[in-house]
């Protein structure tokens, strides 16, 4: 009886173990399947995050490129100065003037001025000018008309001298800007002309210089002639004095005339008008005692 009970208990244990093994296998399979099912989710989440990062980088690059392109693109009107229907072209940032606002240089050396309308993408064309200063003055007029006292001016000290447009329409602004540029050019020309006049007044004219030079030359010539005449007179007087002295020396009285001749008759020699002769030459030479000849 006891043996039969033991056999039944062992059989029941074996049955329990055999029933437990499928449960364990099923749980392991469930765990494995759960792990397998969770791994695609993880991989999909990582791939989605990578894609989102790539998309964000691509969008940022596109935005940066758009900003650079928008900074390089400007609107200009080559034929119509009213600002409507202008052509779009890419311009280099180096064309802009480093000091004046709203001014840039064309390829052939002229300076253009334009200003953007408030809350609009269009620009008001202010004209083409020979100098950057004229274009800057035109921009100041438009800036005052559009933005008022908050406008950034190239010449803030001269704001009171700028003409004001009748209305804020583009045509009136363009007319006032052109007038300001022309007035600026006229003032510059007046200043240059006054400076030239001052220089001319400060320097003597060629006629005055020539007259002064001729007068100096004539004075010098007269002085030289006077000095020469004085020198010649001095030399003439010296020569005259010398001649008079020589005449005094050689015009001595003739000692051999009249009484003087009788006084020197007894001398051994006498002088007759620059000729020396022996006294008694006419009568011949005689010896008082005869010669005695020895045999």
UniProtKB/Swiss-Prot annotation:
Its main location: nucleus. One of its GO terms (biological process) is ethylene-activated signaling pathway. It comes from the Eukaryota. One of its GO terms (cellular component) is nucleus. Residues 99-156 bind DNA. Gene3D superfamilies: AP2/ERF domain. Residues 24-53 have a biased composition (Low complexity). Probably acts as a transcriptional activator. Binds to the GCC-box pathogenesis-related promoter element. May be involved in the regulation of gene expression by stress factors and by components of stress signal transduction pathways. This is Ethylene-responsive transcription factor ERF034. It comes from Arabidopsis thaliana (Mouse-ear cress).
């Amino acid at each position: 009886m006891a043996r039969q009970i033991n056999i039944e208990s062992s059989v029941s244990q074996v049955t329990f173990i055999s029933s437990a093994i499928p449960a364990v296998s099923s749980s392991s399979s469930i765990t494995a399947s759960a792990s397998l099912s969770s791994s695609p989710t993880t991989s999909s989440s990582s791939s989605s995050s990578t894609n989102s990062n790539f998309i964000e980088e691509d969008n940022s690059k596109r935005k940066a490129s758009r900003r650079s392109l928008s900074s390089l693109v400007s609107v200009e009107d080559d034929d119509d100065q009213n600002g409507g229907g202008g052509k779009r072209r890419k311009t280099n940032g180096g064309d802009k003037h480093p000091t004046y606002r709203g001014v840039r240089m064309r390829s052939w050396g002229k300076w253009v001025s334009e200003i953007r309308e408030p809350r609009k993408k269009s620009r008001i064309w202010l004209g083409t000018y020979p100098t950057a200063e004229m274009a800057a003055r035109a921009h100041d007029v438009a800036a005052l008309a559009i933005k008022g006292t908050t406008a950034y001016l190239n010449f803030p000290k001269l704001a009171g001298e700028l003409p004001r447009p009748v209305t804020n329409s583009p045509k009136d602004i363009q007319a006032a800007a052109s007038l300001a540029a022309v007035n600026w050019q006229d003032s510059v020309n007046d200043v240059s002309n006054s400076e030239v006049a001052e220089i001319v007044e400060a320097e003597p004219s060629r006629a005055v210089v020539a007259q002064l030079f001729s007068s100096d030359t004539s004075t010098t010539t007269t002085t030289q002639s006077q000095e020469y005449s004085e020198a010649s007179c001095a030399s003439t007087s010296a020569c005259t004095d010398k001649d008079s002295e020589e005449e005094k020396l050689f015009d001595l009285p003739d000692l051999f005339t009249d009484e003087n001749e009788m006084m020197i008759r007894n001398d051994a020699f006498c002088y007759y008008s620059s000729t020396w002769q022996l006294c008694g030459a006419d009568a011949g030479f005689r010896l008082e005692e005869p010669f005695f000849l020895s045999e």
